[in-house]
Swiss-Prot record:
GO biological process, alphabetically ordered: phosphoenolpyruvate-dependent sugar phosphotransferase system
Highest taxon in the source lineage: Bacteria
Listed GO MF terms: kinase activity; protein-N(PI)-phosphohistidine-sugar phosphotransferase activity; protein-phosphocysteine-sugar phosphotransferase activity
One Pfam family hit: PTS_EIIC
PTS EIIC type-1 domain location: 1-420
EC number(s) reported in the record: 2.7.1.-
Protein known as: PTS system alpha-glucoside-specific EIICB component
Entry text on domains: The EIIC domain forms the PTS system translocation channel and contains the specific substrate-binding site. The EIIB domain is phosphorylated by phospho-EIIA on a cysteinyl or histidyl residue, depending on the transported sugar. Then, it transfers the phosphoryl group to the sugar substrate concomitantly with the sugar uptake processed by the EIIC domain.
Active-site residues, record numbering mapped to chain: 470 (phosphocysteine intermediate)
Length: 540
């Protein structure tokens, strides 16, 4: 059950990866429309510069204005066991069908459900527009539920054989037919139950606003501590992209109000108190540096060059784009205690910042959120808040360094560089020498690359049931865990870490994990095709 939840959480990250670039475009465009940055002349409505900026900004809003649709279409990429493209098409058609059913039922029987479909779909009305359809505002929750349901139907019925005379309805068409019938009761139940859910969401929003600093600490702590399980997606998702604290999610709300916030002289915490729930990126920007410095200075002097080669790219990835797993997994499996301390420090840093008036959209890294969506557009009227944030962040960088260094030395933790064999885990040549591999045996891995090495380490194509990925991890369901090789082999091939649970394995690869997954799937297809050809030749 847990592996299925983790798989679902990982699939949610596929559409999430579209937001950083969109956020950068919107943030820069709003900054260029601000007369305090570019002058009154360039921001005049009849200015060619202003018109071009407006056109570009509208393109940047694509992802934000179509979040439910994007989440619905994006999930099957990670959840469908085969023919992911066809699954996405089936989900798209079914999701639109569901919304059309909601619209028709609401317009016809709105009085029965207690929903006024004649109202304009404005904020607070409970209604919204999706692909030109007036429907209930179920945010990304409805999209995720419907997408998951239709993908399950795809996994079950895509291969179902039909009689020859019904062959035209086989495959995706049959999935859409089954889903069409399923969407009728789904729409009915949505109209019946969602208005009550909306009341519950409003109560949750009020509670979280009143929770203040305590709510921020608990939220940030859970978001960090659950990273090894992959369940952290279910913590931040409802806040950043869903309606947990504001309608439409913190990401969209901040982008929509960025212009007004940047031109207001009121404190940002007064304007946007909910912004405390989007401070989890501070541990990525400031905490990562302290962790990396502690790991470097506790390594043996003769190993520090090698350790630096491991830590510098991982730390830059965390700081610039907010992906922390390559760094965190260098010490997570060596000492879970360090990771727990990391979660406590991250939550405490965000809480201290919030108490001192720091709010905003700081969930990512410097390049995607800190600079374009916060510091640059807010500098004119809110520079003091930024200096407070940076000051607190640097203090916590030092605190991270002291705490991690003390724990590593006092507990004699074998972090990278404190034991010779640990460094060799990150060097393929060293590992092969230690294992006594011959050059001939190692050559295929070198030739076929990392994916081929992972395939062998996983026990071959026959030992893999399904492959999925999130931002940095391969998530693989296996036939037999005993056929896999040791974690050392995966690390020698470039993995940052390995998580094993039952017959499921997670290989922490890095930001190039989508390419590795595609290569793995192609290698598996080639392997199965070769086996089929061999069997055919044997029979003939």
């Amino acid at each position: 059950m847990l592996s299925q939840i983790q798989r679902f959480g990982g699939a949610m990250f596929t559409p999430v990866l579209l937001f950083p670039f969109a956020g950068i475009v919107v943030g820069i465009a709003i900054m260029l429309r601000n007369p305090m940055f570019v002058g009154e002349a360039l921001t005049a409505p009849d200015s060619l510069f202003a018109q071009i900026v407006h056109i570009i900004e509208e393109g940047g809003w694509t992802v934000f204005r179509n979040m439910p649709l994007i989440f619905a279409v994006g999930l099957p990429i990670g959840l469908a066991k085969q023919a992911q493209g066809r699954a996405c098409l089936a989900v798209l058609v079914s999701f639109l069908t569901w919304n059309y059913f909601i619209n028709a039922m609401g317009m016809t029987w709105g009085h029965f459900f207690g929903v006024d479909f004649s109202a304009e779909p404005t904020a607070g009305s409970g209604l919204t527009m999706i692909a030109g359809i007036k429907t209930l505002d179920t945010s990304i929750i409805g999209a995720i539920v419907i997408s998951g349901l239709v993908t399950a139907l795809h996994n079950r019925y895509f291969d179902k054989p039909l009689p020859v005379f019904l062959g035209i309805f086989q495959g995706s068409s049959f999935v859409v037919i089954v889903a069409f019938l399923a969407m009728i009761p789904c729409a009915w139940l949505t109209l019946l139950g969602w208005p009550k859910v909306q009341l519950g969401i409003e109560s949750l929003q009020a509670f979280l606003r009143s929770a203040g600093a305590l709510g921020v600490w608990v939220y940030i702590f859970l978001e960090r501590i659950l990273i090894p399980t992959g369940l952290h997606h279910f913590v931040y998702g409802p806040f950043i992209f869903g309606p947990a604290v504001v309608e439409g999610g913190l990401q969209v709300y901040w982008a929509e109000h960025l212009q007004a916030f940047s031109q207001s002289t009121e404190p940002l915490k007064t304007l946007f108190p909910e912004g405390g729930f989007a401070l989890h990126g501070n541990s990525k920007v400031f905490g990562s540096v302290g962790i990396a410095l502690a790991l470097y200075f506790t390594a043996a002097p003769e190993n520090r060059v090698k350790v630096a080669g491991l830590l510098i790219p991982a730390t830059l990835t965390a700081m610039l784009v907010g992906i922390t797993e390559p760094l965190e997994f260098t010490f997570l499996f060596i000492s879970p205690l360090l990771f727990a301390v990391h979660a406590v420090l991250a939550a405490t840093m965000a809480t201290v910042m919030y108490i001192c008036g720091v709010v905003g959209n700081f969930g990512g890294g410097l390049l995607d959120q800190f600079l374009p969506q916060n510091w640059i557009p807010m500098f004119h009227h809110h520079a003091s808040m930024m200096f407070i944030q940076i000051g607190i962040g640097l203090c916590f960088t030092a605190l991270y360094f002291v705490v991690f260094r003390t724990l590593i030395l006092r507990l004699n933790l074998k972090t990278p560089g404190r034991e010779e064999s640990e460094i060799k885990l990150y060097s393929k040549a060293d590992y092969q020498a230690a294992r006594g591999k011959t050059t001939a045996a190692a050559a295929p891995e070198t030739r076929l690359g990392q994916a081929a090495g992972f395939l062998q380490a996983l026990g071959g194509a026959d030992n893999i049931e399904s492959i999925n990925n999130c931002a940095t991890r391969l998530r693989i369901a296996l036939v037999d865990m005993a056929k896999t090789q040791s974690d050392d082999v995966f690390k020698a091939l470039g993995a940052h870490g390995v998580v094993r649970r039952g017959n499921g394995i997670q290989v922490i690869v890095g930001l190039h994990v989508p390419q590795v997954r595609d290569q793995l799937e192609n290698l598996m297809k080639d392997s199965l095709s070769t086996e089929h050809t061999t069997m055919t030749e044997a029979v003939s």
